[in-house]
Amino acid sequence: MYREPVRVRPLGPRDVDAVCARVEARVAAAAARSTALVGTLDHDELRAVVSAVTPAWVARSRGRVVGHLVTTMIDRTQRRAWIPPDGASFDDPAVLRGLLDAAASVWRDAGASGYAAWVYDEPTEVDAWATCGATLSARRGVRALSFPADRGTPAGFDLRRAGPGDLETALTLDRWGDPPGGRPPDEQERRDEVASLLEDPDIDYLIAELGGRALAQAVVMPLAPRRGSRAPAVHLSAVAVDPDRRGRGLGTALVESVLERARRAGHVVAEVNWRTVDPRVERFWRGRGFTPTQALVERPLPV
């Protein structure tokens, strides 16, 4: 437990260099754990970002910065404050608790009822958030696309890019991806979202067919450059397989075919998020070569 006196206040100009140094150290440490991450940052660019970001707080003790906290946005739809992986640092869980306590009233005033933080998936870090009441809900895994896919596909397997005319098929496939026991989205919201994805020229809505029957899907979108991440990169989402075909290799064939398509298009890294509620999902993505790099922790704000 941190025993030195700690004072938390809004981040000011004299804190910027110290916060930048902490962010750079965290990014370098994360890259040392995963070759799919980049360990160096553009210092001037980082300094400009830290100088301008708001709301942000620092924890200081005996003249030095011992922690910081940044909120990148308030999601008014889900009413959550979002914290990126390099948006928090702390020398001790008690420092993190002090930062979160200071931020809570500002988040409430902005309309948030809770927070969600993407943190580096390192046990001591995840445990520190847990001591502050946050719950691990998802992981983000990364896989390098250095080599061609080494798995074959079943006879009659075909992967194609869907379009607006595939809306009803895509809606059926998308429902198969709903987490078991979870609350499914409103059907009109689902229809609007799937239709938007099918119409977006920058997004690949891919449907896998076996013998001419649509049995699986994946949505692939290019990722904008992010601090600490390799580029060009793609994000996989909405991966779904016909429940009657699960466990027969169709999901593996889908993912490997999608990744090979991305590799041939020039992408060097793929990432995917998965919920931790189902250990089978975790095993599947780890088995496909995705290494967890970040964890999503969430908590409602105390009343």
Residue ranges and their predicted role:
Residues 7-21, 30-33, 158-172:
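A short beta-loop-alpha structural element at the N-terminal edge
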Residues 155-234:
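Flexible, substrate/cofactor-facing loop regions flanked by secondary structure
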Residues 35, 39-98, 210, 218-239:
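Conserved donor-binding loop and adjoining core beta-sheet/short helix segment
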Residues 127-129, 285, 290:
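Conserved active-site tyrosine of GNAT-family acetyltransferases
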